[in-house]
Amino acid sequence: MPDPRDLQLSSYDYPLPQERIAQVPAEPRHSARMLMVPPATQALEAARHGVVWDLLEELQPGDLLVVNNTRVLKARLKVRRSGGGLSELLVLEPRGEGRWLCLARPAKRMRPGDVLTIDGTSIGLTVLEDDAASGGRLVQFPTDCRDAETIETLLNQWGEVPLPPYIDRHDPDDVERYQTRYADRPGAVAAPTAGLHFSDELLAGLQLKGVELARITLHVGLGTFRPVETNDLTRLELHSEWVEVSAAVVEAIQRCRGRVIAVGTTSVRALEGAAQQNGGVLQPFTGPVNLVIQPGYRFAVVQGLMTNFHLPKSSLLLLVSALIGREKLLAIYTEAIERNYRFFSYGDAMWIAPEAVLSQAEPVGH
């Protein structure tokens, strides 16, 4: 019988001291701390504490790491309104013919019909309409800005790295550090942060050990970072995000002789979302995914997960709870806070090996 508290957002809250929110990343990348979740049959006291470099011991030859190769756009754009006031757009996703869905700040100052200019330029934009589903605005950019690849040139020149609001500083180094080392598909407005821990040295070491790497794409957007707005999780809906799971990835998973390990919640969402398009059987897929993963979900593909520590009452916390259970997750978070782990995007990591996953969550056939 499922615990009814698992389906209430208020059950996923926890107190976090402000000083535990990481403002800068670990250097080198693989030196971030890593909490290793104990097996499902063992108590919390069996948790181990190390660093991300320890993945060289935790992963075995034949294991398959699935990473998200999305690249973060410099999607935060300062614009001038016709009266001269300064506003900000967060450029989210293309809607065709140079039209882009954007979040506006302050939103009440930006209405349909308003003409904007990118600050410091003569490049004009027009607010076309409100988007009720996202709370954003549909904005007309130059028509050659039709997709992430074509708008990236403009954003690289005039945009800023869209760091999360809880990182209260600006540093030119973020242009490089807020990207994974394997990011090559532009389109995200937030980094798949678990992947930030993988240095070139760690990736090379894993390859030498015989750990394989497969690359999916999920362009991180509203579906990942938008706050959950309902306490009744049976009614939860998430904004869709664009996903590509290629035939090469499907083949790598089918021939995997070890364990399928997702790097980050976005890799989980991509793989499981693609599988749910085909009745739980993974096939190549390109398109939008809005899958909700929360306690009670039966995983089709993913066997283990490396992830960061997530915000209270977030959809990401629900996803991790689906793997190891809500009560255990919150107990682990309490332990991490007491041991001074660093939280959120630039913070430390958790390693959830397959033996730590709840039996009812394990993929069928593995």
From Swiss-Prot:
Metabolic or biological pathway: tRNA modification; tRNA-queuosine biosynthesis
EC number: 2.4.99.17
Keyword Cytoplasm set for record: yes
Lineage: Bacteria, Bacillati, Cyanobacteriota, Cyanophyceae, Synechococcales
Organism: Parasynechococcus marenigrum (strain WH8102)
InterPro entries listed in its UniProt record: QueA, QueA_dom1, QueA_dom2, QueA_sf
HAMAP family noted in UniProt: QueA
Similarity comment: family membership: Belongs to the QueA family.
GO terms classed as biological process: queuosine biosynthetic process; tRNA wobble guanine modification
Superkingdom, natural source: Bacteria
GO annotation, cellular component aspect: cytoplasm
Primary role: Transfers and isomerizes the ribose moiety from AdoMet to the 7-aminomethyl group of 7-deazaguanine (preQ1-tRNA) to give epoxyqueuosine (oQ-tRNA).
Catalytic activity: 7-aminomethyl-7-carbaguanosine(34) in tRNA + S-adenosyl-L-methionine = epoxyqueuosine(34) in tRNA + adenine + L-methionine + 2 H(+)
Summary of subunit composition and partner proteins: Monomer.
Gene Ontology MF, one: S-adenosylmethionine:tRNA ribosyltransferase-isomerase activity
Family matches, as PANTHER family: S-ADENOSYLMETHIONINE:TRNA RIBOSYLTRANSFERASE-ISOMERASE
Alphabetized UniProt keyword annotations: Cytoplasm, Queuosine biosynthesis, S-adenosyl-L-methionine, Transferase
Compartment(s) where it occurs, according to its Swiss-Prot or TrEMBL record: Cytoplasm
Name by which UniProt lists this protein: S-adenosylmethionine:tRNA ribosyltransferase-isomerase
SUPFAM superfamilies: QueA-like
